[in-house]
């Protein structure tokens, strides 16, 4: 918000030792996910359960009695933290001592953050006993809101993931309220890093005609498809295929960043129902398949094939289609327009003429709006385009050695995007009316500085409100316990250009918070304000759209001189376990009001 005074906070749980600094760092950088170790929604689904041994299971010889008494049943665990601890301990116990990685937080020294999401942060780290660098994903289990059974099953399934094109899982353990997942760290970064360095090496003028050549693209995509084939044959969906999640090792190995748990926790037993896949709306949906956006009938592994098609465009042009637009506009463009092509990013005719028919055919087939018409990973590997692919040595030469002198480009927490407004169409549906997209990232450093200033503003305290004070919102009038006007508000009339508002919503600790902010018509957008609330962790990421829509409703009421001063609405994030939605107490609901 350009001129808003955002106030409010959420209670945070302090972690010990290195995790404390890590958690603080992640909270300050939770706006978007652009790093190579993306932490929003990665792999979902499970392996075929026939190949997995469940925790605490018993075994007998066929046709005979067991040779030894069966082990006692596993202890009953009643929280995600206890479940994660039990599952992780069971996995470690199955390993030979020589293969075991340390499972104490003190054995690792966390370094820089390389990926930030709504419920987790990925760090580079140093394993002291093994004298080895690793990647550690720190997942806040309280925010995951997953069941005990899901957590136990998915940690075990993740440990069984073993493929040369998937990042290796080492171990996992509990550190305070967090689950730490230790994985291999690939030291050459992601394909997003490579794209940025390539653009810097050849210059923006040359890069506008294509960033990577077809041979490099074919080699990279072939390895990605091998990893996806492995996922899909084992009943998994990755859901976050993009350049930032495709990693490169110094020997030319391509691996998919599979940080498992935050994505695995989003579904259970292959259940791809609407309720289980809501989490896909975290982050910019440039790579998201239409059926995932619609959230009507669920989706299957063909969603990854769509993302692969977007990845192909990204590797060629340097960016995904619609990357300059706000998330809501990306949703609209993807759903309403024809599928993107290589020319979607073009600004002139024949801009990408260097790319041939076989490459464009691959993109076209991947980006079929009907999932049934998209080929499988196994079928794609037979496409003629991949005959152009080379071996790992080629990638070492073209993507590592040739770019060795180019400095690594720092990741910004988010790109500058176009502004716009939510408007209601003739049928009463909400649509995003955008201004013009940004043409350059040259101001990104200034943007980051401005963002830091806004984050400091957002650290102002929120006032805790009693449950009884939430009554009255259902009628649409001012609630009897509605937040009081700011001091001095009765003496002066605020500028008509600016509206003072307050959002009353429960935090993760289920306490009612009043989050005060202002809306300036000439400077703010409702989508931008909602995004800032998510960034400051004042509202759940799943509530971004619904908060923006109701904020626009209230603004419309104010502009029409309506007497209505408050709106109560249901939240997409729902309620916690053992809670019942209650509009009166704002359990599963929120209330937005105008201040006098």
Swiss-Prot record:
Write the Enzyme Commission number(s) for this entry: 2.7.11.1
- On this chain, the residues bearing Phosphothreonine are 13, 32, 280
InterPro entries xrefs:
Kinase-like_dom_sf, Kinase_OSR1/WNK_CCT, Prot_kinase_dom, Protein_kinase_ATP_BS, STE20/SPS1-PAK
Q: Which segments show compositional bias classed as Pro residues?
A: 67-77
User: What does the entry list under GO cellular component?
Assistant: cytoplasm; nucleus
Arranged from A to Z, the UniProt key words for this protein are: ATP-binding, Cytoplasm, Developmental protein, Differentiation, Kinase, Meiosis, Nucleotide-binding, Nucleus, Phosphoprotein, Serine/threonine-protein kinase, Spermatogenesis, Transferase
> What's an example of a GO molecular-function annotation for this chain?
ATP binding
- What SUPFAM superfamilies does the entry give? Protein kinase-like (PK-like) (SSF56112)
User: What compartments host this protein?
Assistant: Cytoplasm; Nucleus
Q: Has UniProt tagged this entry with the keyword Transferase? A: yes
Residue ranges annotated as compositionally biased, kind Low complexity, are 1-54
Q: How is it modified after translation?
A: Phosphorylated at Thr-280 and Ser-419 probably by wnk-1; phosphorylation results in weak activation. Predominantly autophosphorylated at Thr-32 and Ser-190 and weakly autophosphorylated at Thr-13 and Ser-405 in vitro.
Report the residue ranges that make up the Protein kinase domain in this protein. Answer: 108-386
Q: Which residues form the active site?
A: 240
GO biological process terms, semicolon-separated: cell differentiation; cellular hyperosmotic response; epithelial tube morphogenesis; hyperosmotic response; intracellular signal transduction; meiotic cell cycle; multicellular organismal-level water homeostasis; positive regulation of gene expression
Phosphoserine is found on 190, 405, 419
Classification via PROSITE patterns:
PROTEIN_KINASE_ATP (PS00107), PROTEIN_KINASE_DOM (PS50011)
EC top class, as a word: transferase
Q: What role is this protein assigned? A: Plays a role in osmotic stress responses by regulating ion homeostasis and by controlling cell volume via the phosphorylation-mediated inhibition of the chloride channel clh-3. In addition, increases gpdh-1 translation upon osmotic stress, likely downstream of wnk-1. Involved in several developmental processes including the tubular formation of the excretory canals, the formation of the intestine and the progression through larval stages. In addition, required for germ line development by controlling meiosis and chromosomal segregation during spermatogenesis.
**What is said about its interaction partners and assembly?**
Interacts (via C-terminus) with clh-3; required for the phosphorylation-mediated inhibition of clh-3 function. Interacts (via C-terminus) with wnk-1; the interaction is direct.
Tell me which PANTHER family the record gives. NON-SPECIFIC SERINE_THREONINE PROTEIN KINASE (PTHR48012:SF16), STERILE20-LIKE KINASE, ISOFORM B-RELATED (PTHR48012)
Sequence similarity: Belongs to the protein kinase superfamily. STE Ser/Thr protein kinase family. STE20 subfamily.
**Official protein name in the record:** Germinal center kinase 3
Species name: Caenorhabditis elegans
